[in-house]
């Protein structure tokens, strides 16, 4: 599986141009992308990290990291996914960085999703949806999610980079992913959720034994 993740990471490097500021996601496939990026770090201007973990990895490779607030133009964002379909709709957030990932993805002109073939699905929903929640609202939000048909589980011992908690929600209906994304976000106490149906991936680079294909 690591070989496929490396393939996908290498394929994303082809989209990196000189003097670019690059948004960098979070997760195991992205970690391989960071390794590849380190080889051309002299060509790029800097990176914007979607998590403290990614920032630490970038800095360890000697890659400059800048704050998103100092960026006016972010041409590209590279990130993985827990699930992705052919339309570029995704479930993300298994690593708990979903809020910052969604922010950086929305700032970027182009969102490139890098995955191995196991992440490609016809219908989203096997993987639970991570929901970032203000701690005091945990029980209330969980009750509201149950009303939506979901089964929330508190992610024990995990605190997001924003100081919040995560509810992992199983068995949600994905008949209309965009409506689901909205219905979760309007619950008071919800910061963000891991359904990416409004900000789609522009390119989905899928690695398999036969090579890397663009799903979109």
Swiss-Prot record:
Pathway where this protein functions: Carbohydrate degradation; pentose phosphate pathway; D-ribose 5-phosphate from D-ribulose 5-phosphate (non-oxidative stage): step 1/1
Q: Which UniProt keywords apply?
A: Isomerase
Which reaction(s) does the protein catalyse, per the Swiss-Prot or TrEMBL entry? Answer: aldehydo-D-ribose 5-phosphate = D-ribulose 5-phosphate
Single GO molecular function: ribose-5-phosphate isomerase activity
Gene Ontology BP terms? D-ribose metabolic process; pentose-phosphate shunt, non-oxidative branch
Enzyme kind, highest EC tier: isomerase
Source domain of life is Bacteria
Q: Name one GO cellular component term.
A: cytosol
Active site (catalytic residues): 101
Residue numbers binding substrate? 26-29, 79-82, 92-95, 119
Question: Could you say which EC number(s) this protein's record lists?
Answer: 5.3.1.6
- So where does this one cross the membrane? none
- Any one Pfam family match given in the protein's UniProt record, by short name: Rib_5-P_isom_A
Which SUPFAM superfamilies does the UniProt entry name for this protein? Answer: D-ribose-5-phosphate isomerase (RpiA), lid domain, NagB/RpiA/CoA transferase-like
* NCBIfam families reported for this sequence: PRK00702.1 (NF001924), rpiA (TIGR00021)
- Of which family is this protein a member? Belongs to the ribose 5-phosphate isomerase family.
Protein function: Catalyzes the reversible conversion of ribose-5-phosphate to ribulose 5-phosphate.
How is the subunit organization of this protein annotated in UniProt? Homodimer.
Protein name from the UniProt record: Ribose-5-phosphate isomerase A
Q: Which gene encodes it?
A: rpiA
